Amino acid sequence: MSLEPTLRDLLHSKLQWIFVGGKGGVGKTTTSCALATLFASTPVHDAVTNTTRPRRVLLISTDPAHNLSDAFSQKFGKTPVPVNGMEETLFAMEVDPTTFTHGGFGAMLGFPGHIATDADAPSPFAALGNILKEAAGTLPGIDELSVFAEILRGVQQLSYDVVIFDTAPTGHTLRLLALPHTLNSTMEKLLSVEGLNTLIQAASAVLSSTTNLGDMSSLMPAFKQWRENVQEVQRQFTDAEKTAFICVCIPEFLSVYETERLVQELMKYDISCDSIVVNQLVLKPSSEPDCRMCNARQKIQSKYLAQIDSLYEDFHVVKMPLLSDEVRGVPALQRFAQFLLEPYDADRHGYIDVCGAAS
């Protein structure tokens, strides 16, 4: 049975983490920004005081191509900045995943100082830490996982009600989703006596046969902390009460193909996903004269819309119209967001321009 073609249910949930992902160029950033304005405009019930209060929302871009600044016509950086016009409720930041991996990797893992890859550290543990950092840095998805683990620790202290991620294109996202499971399995083996001995022998061989690694028992707490961090990320990912993934696509072959691949991977790793946003639909009022180009595009799109409706009949499938211009600034994003809550109807709503006027 088809679900309501809106994202209204999300606004009344207790979700803490929302990921918006899909193929590049399908409108992920516009969708995530519009969704963020919706959450920031919707009060949340405070169980302690039994009253409603403004909801605090953090929007984070982990896409190296960062477009949040363009979407809001405002500059963002690696720390949360209030969004103009919604200063009390909506904050945004753009982070470079590689800086988390290479700049704060030891801290993310919970390594003690003497193996945190400090260049001034006198102990040979510093060299071992560098080896571990370089080895882990080659893992696909480690950049994105580092971001999430760091944010998971920091954001919980900043009193945000919900964090929305504007993610990198599908390939990066799939690696991120798979990594906690892979790392957790690896760490289980590594933390066994045999696994740790193997690591020690390998490290000794690399550093040199004469290097004294000292008391290797101090490594155990560090690796246990790493495993706990990874396991916490995995718990958050797979908790349907806390985490949801929204797939964004357009009605074209490659986008629909990648969406199905993404949905299958989400199911594989037990990550909740029951919402799909289909952008850039050519929809015109019935009173408008025929347009040869419009009819051709509608014919192509209707083919893939039929596939989407068939594949995701138990999803919230939100169908968004192609607009007359780019969606930039809070007013335009809020106008776009209206149709995440209310199904767009060309005869009733007419053409929508970026200023929010219907014609």
Curated annotation (Swiss-Prot):
GO MF assignments: ATP binding; ATP hydrolysis activity; metal ion binding
Residues at which Zn(2+) binds: C291, C294
GO biological process, one term: tail-anchored membrane protein insertion into ER membrane
Active-site residue numbers: D63
Similarity comment: Belongs to the arsA ATPase family.
Function: ATPase required for the post-translational delivery of tail-anchored (TA) proteins to the endoplasmic reticulum. Recognizes and selectively binds the transmembrane domain of TA proteins in the cytosol. This complex then targets to the endoplasmic reticulum by membrane-bound receptors, where the tail-anchored protein is released for insertion. This process is regulated by ATP binding and hydrolysis. ATP binding drives the homodimer towards the closed dimer state, facilitating recognition of newly synthesized TA membrane proteins. ATP hydrolysis is required for insertion.
Name of the protein this chain belongs to: ATPase ASNA1 homolog
